[in-house]
């Protein structure tokens, strides 16, 4: 829907951006949630993060955030980047609907992740994370779902930032978990839970945030606010040939493998939602 029907969605395609936000709200409502918007103005236009909340039981003040950005760069329909991440958030929200979990789980679709707003105060996730910090929210962990749908069995299909080149496989058939050093406990817990649920290939790294690519999504905003956060990704530009182009279309994605990743992420959320599991 986001890539195939709505297409490019950003401040310069504002009608499409708003249709995307409404679509996400409708899907969350259909799954049994009250969809809420966090709205802020930019260029005299209202922009929205869209949120659904599964209230926790015994540890409701502790919060787990599962997020993905729904905007695209100009000229790009954004199937992998990042309709795939949004689809995963919506599917996971549906799976957890009506459940009881100790910690509160927030499912959030962020606006304005892409340039020129990337890593600025106008990034939707920065607005969200800063508001959470101002309220004193206790975020136990944040997962940024960023480009989840492209996989290859070809040798040489996977590349890396220079600082870690040669340390990981050169075949792009895995999902990646990436965190900064301060979030290593979150990453290790997520990795254990994922591997207990599925045998899908997983590579993980807790590395300095200064390495190029490590902070390239909404988890970066939560690091800036002092929260533990990690990115779940197929590595986007380090693997995907159509990154930020008009050819980032739904036919490029591997939906079977994406489904396996979502299964593993369900287990990750189940683990993080229970303190000390």
Task: Please place each PLM-identified region on the residue numbering.
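A mature extracytoplasmic/lumenal domain signature
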Residues: 39-41, 56, 68-72, 109-111, ...
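Active-site-adjacent substrate-binding region
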Residues: 141, 148-277
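Extracytoplasmic/secreted proteins, especially bacterial periplasmic and envelope-associated proteins
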Residues: 1, 15, 19-35, 84, ...
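A non-catalytic alpha/beta surface segment that caps or lines the substrate-entry region
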Residues: 1-59, 203-205
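Acidic/histidine-rich, surface-exposed loop or edge segments in extracytoplasmic proteins
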Residues: 1-10, 68, 109-110, 168-173, ...
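Acidic/histidine-rich catalytic neighborhood of metal-dependent amide-processing enzymes
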Residues: 73-188, 211-214
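Sec-exported extracytoplasmic/periplasmic mature domains
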Residues: 3-11, 25, 29-34, 93-101, ...
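Structural recognition of the beta-strand scaffold that forms the well-ordered cores
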Residues: 37, 51, 63-67, 106-109, ...
């Amino acid at each position: 829907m986001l890539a195939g029907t709505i297409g490019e969605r950003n401040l310069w395609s504002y009608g499409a951006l708003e249709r995307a936000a409404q679509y996400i709200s409708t899907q969350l409502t259909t799954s049994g949630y009250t969809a809420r918007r966090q709205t802020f103005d930019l260029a005299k236009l209202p922009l929205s993060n869209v949120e659904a909340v599964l209230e926790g039981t015994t540890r409701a003040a502790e919060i787990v955030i599962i997020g993905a950005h729904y905007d695209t760069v100009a000229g790009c329909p954004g199937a992998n980047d990042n309709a795939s991440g949004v689809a995963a958030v919506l599917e996971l929200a549906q799976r957890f609907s009506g459940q009881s979990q100790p910690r509160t789980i927030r499912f959030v679709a962020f606006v304005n992740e892409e340039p020129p707003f990337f890593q600025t105060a106008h990034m939707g996730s920065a607005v969200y994370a800063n508001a959470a910090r101002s309220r004193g929210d206790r975020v136990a962990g944040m997962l940024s779902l960023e480009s989840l749908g492209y996989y290859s069995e070809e040798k040489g299909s996977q590349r890396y930032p220079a600082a870690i080149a040669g340390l990981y496989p050169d075949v792009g058939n895995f999902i990646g978990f990436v965190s900064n050093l301060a979030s290593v406990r979150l990453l290790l817990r997520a990795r254990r839970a994922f591997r207990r649920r599925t045998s899908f290939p997983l590579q993980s790294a807790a590395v300095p945030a200064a390495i190029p690519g490590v902070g390239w999504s909404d988890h970066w905003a939560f690091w800036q606010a002092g929260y533990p956060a990690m990115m779940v990704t197929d590595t986007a530009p380090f693997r995907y040939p159509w990154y930020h182009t008009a050819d980032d279309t739904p036919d490029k994605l591997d939906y079977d493998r994406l489904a396996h990743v979502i299964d593993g992420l369900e287990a990750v959320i189940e683990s993080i939602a229970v303190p000390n599991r």
